[in-house]
Amino acid sequence: MTTPVTILHGATVFTAAGGDPFEGSVVVAGDRIANVLTGPSAPSRSGRVIDLHGATLLPGLIDAHVHAAAVRADIQDQHRDLFDSELAVLTARSLTEMLERGFTTVRDAGGADAGYRRLIERGDLAGPRLLVSGRPLTQTGGHGDSRRATESHDFAACPRAQGMTHAVADGPDAVRHAAREELRRGADQIKVMAGGGVMSPTDRLESVQYSLAELSAAVGAAAASGTYVLAHAYTPEAIEVCVAAGVRSIEHGNLLNEPVARLMAQAGTFLVPTLVTYEKLYEQGEELGIPRANLDKLGAIIDAGVNSLRIARGAGVKIGSGSDLLGPMRVHQGREIALQAQALGAAGAIVAATRTNAELLGIDAETGTIEPGKAADLIAVDGDPLADPGLLADPGRLRLVMRAGRTHIDRTG
């Protein structure tokens, strides 16, 4: 059987592998990039030729922090209001929409289970390459413990539901068991809540959650299964404990300071900023039903986000890219790149959302750059996102979206 060949010709190509953009062509054979050619001439190889003049060809985008199952902005109550069947359909739809926004790989940071990954891998669901974390681990009263202060029942007595549920575990043994349980259920990596957050009802944003021993137990369980831990943390105090425990990536990190950034760089710990979620929570949160008590927590972090990137960059921390958007705010997923460009520059922000994220996720041999032999995860954007990264926030600018050689959006003709 002949392998189908597609020639993407005439675009400005930004490989994200190093070097400047250039006019050229990319040859796709089956699900792989077969060749990358410079110059205006179309390659002589036979195959379907797609004219991309006026567009920029990039690696497919990677979002290292999504919550596909956060189908409503007020995630604390969605499991009380939706049947599991409703939530499953809405979660599947959200994954398809991420692919249609140019994200060919996403890491779910809590909520989606391995079933969605299997659906995508089998071809039963159009969606990005998906790595799932299962249920995030949190301590009693920590970020993700959705019980209100007035509720006295044990967390385990809460009705089991899909979506934005968490595993409450206290003490190293319980944390180790909880991590192993999520791995048993198919998690690709483990998510822990190491500090306070915006969306939970009882914890303070500045609180440090989970001890070194507890975090080390989670890291050990993950490492024994050949994977890693990502940790929700805002403050230097919480981040420092995570680094000491061997956590691979810090999610958010808005209040990062220089001494702790240096520790992260020395340890090889990644930072995954999620600037866009704070912008959109501030703009839309109240009208979408998020309680005022939660939104009041934004003050300490919304203006600190870009500065944390500058601190991290100055210290040599590897910076990835996430969105963390909830419910209808997810339409702004691509805006994260423009926000990060304020600190990293446009090219740096695109690299964060492609090559660096691929390295973080351990899939850099497969995707993240435009190089021969890698998966044909590619997007073509009308215009020049290296001059205006805001173009990536508009899915209507996408002329082509290809994942593993399969075309999902084609507006070329």
Predicted regions and their residues:
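His/Asp/Glu-enriched, well-ordered alpha-helical/loop segment
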Residues: 224, 228, 289-293, 299-385
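Histidine-centered divalent metal-coordination motifs
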Residues: 10, 65-67, 232, 252
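N-terminal metal-binding scaffold of metallo-dependent hydrolase/deaminase domains
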Residues: 1-44, 57, 385-388, 406-407
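Histidine/acidic residue-rich metal-binding segments in metalloenzymes
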Residues: 173-271, 287-289, 298-319, 365
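Divalent metal-dependent hydrolysis catalytic cores, especially in the metallo-beta-lactamase
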Residues: 88-116, 126-136, 187-201, 228, ...
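Histidine/acidic-residue-rich catalytic or RNA/ligand-binding cores of hydrolases
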Residues: 72-76, 201, 239-245, 275-290, ...
